[in-house]
Regions:
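Conserved glycine-rich Rossmann-like NAD(P)H-binding loop of the short-chain dehydrogenase/reductase
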Residues: 23-40
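Residue(s) in the substrate-gating loop at a strand-loop-helix junction
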Residues: 132
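Conserved glycine-rich cofactor-binding loop
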Residues: 9-10
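Conserved NAD(P)H cofactor-binding loop of Rossmann-fold oxidoreductase domains
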Residues: 80-85
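Active-site helix of classical SDR
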Residues: 112, 148
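Substrate-binding pocket helix/loop in short-chain dehydrogenase/reductase
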Residues: 88-90, 96-101
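C-terminal helical subdomain
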Residues: 174, 191-227
């Protein structure tokens, strides 16, 4: 079995690599930071699996296409690369937001599409798109990030229905955690009001749920309730609540 993991140098991606290597998966690990990838590869060598590292910035569209040309015949795709930013929409950095859209949306879209085509040809394979509970609600003061995760949720939901109608054995799932203790928080320049989940526990839970064939993977009771609350409440109310939460983050920096 072979898995391709993007955003593999830290956080959930790194911890999924640890989980899958213990399960005997050969791994292709992709991230921008080659040094961290080398460290992770060295760590995982004890599991006697084949590990290939690819230092690549997936915010660049051509890199995504090149990755697909280079890496073939995978059984499991984990789209995990991504980052966020926090602040008033008119004050956040435009170039950073464009890079975020390329990483969080376009890279996911390209890799999901190209590898799904491959998987459908052999009628097997798994795709896990790492989204966020943010994908189910509006997110003032993190507007671009929330919008990117909403795209991932809706894209994945739509693909799932297409696969169901075709009776395909290819599986797609979405991981939608709340705050997780990862490098994301430093990049997004925020401190969360909610208690942050342990990234290894989130990764282990996600892999376990994928193996069970689950589509929505939402770690934690409080996060599950947040999804339900966002679904049954008016968007205007959810926006007000989210604004207050994000404001606290900015004040805690």
């Amino acid at each position: 079995m072979k898995a391709l993991i993007t955003g593999a140098s830290s956080g959930i991606g790194r911890d999924m690599a640890r989980n899958l290597s213990k399960r005997g998966y050969d791994l292709i690990l992709v991230a921008r930071d080659e040094n961290r990838l080398q460290e992770l590869k060295k760590e995982l060598e004890i599991y006697k699996v084949n590990i290939e590292i690819i230092a690549m910035d997936l915010a660049i569209e051509e890199n995504c296409k090149e990755l697909h040309k280079k890496v073939k015949d995978i059984d499991f795709l984990i789209n995990n690369a991504g980052f966020g930013d926090c602040g008033d929409f008119t004050k956040t950095d435009l170039d950073k937001e464009i890079a975020m859209i390329h990483t969080n949306i376009i890279a996911y879209h390209i890799l999901t599409k190209l590898y799904l085509i491959d998987m459908k040809k052999v009628n097997r394979g798994k795709i896990l798109n790492v989204a966020s509970i943010a994908g189910f609600m509006p997110g003032p003061l993190m507007s671009t990030y929330y919008a990117t995760k909403s795209y991932v949720v809706r894209l994945s939901e739509s693909i799932r229905e297409e696969l169901r109608k075709e009776n395909s054995k290819v599986q797609i799932s979405i991981l939608c955690p709340g705050p997780v203790d990862t490098n994301f928080n430093k990049v997004a320049n925020v401190k969360f009001h909610m208690r942050e989940a342990n990234s290894q526990k989130v990764a282990d839970y996600a892999i376990k749920q994928v193996q069970k064939g689950k589509f929505y993977i939402i770690p934690g009771i409080d996060v599950k309730f947040a999804k339900i609350g966002a679904k049954i409440s008016p968007a205007s109310i959810v926006s007000k609540i989210t604004y207050k939460i994000q404001k606290r983050k900015l004040q805690r920096k």
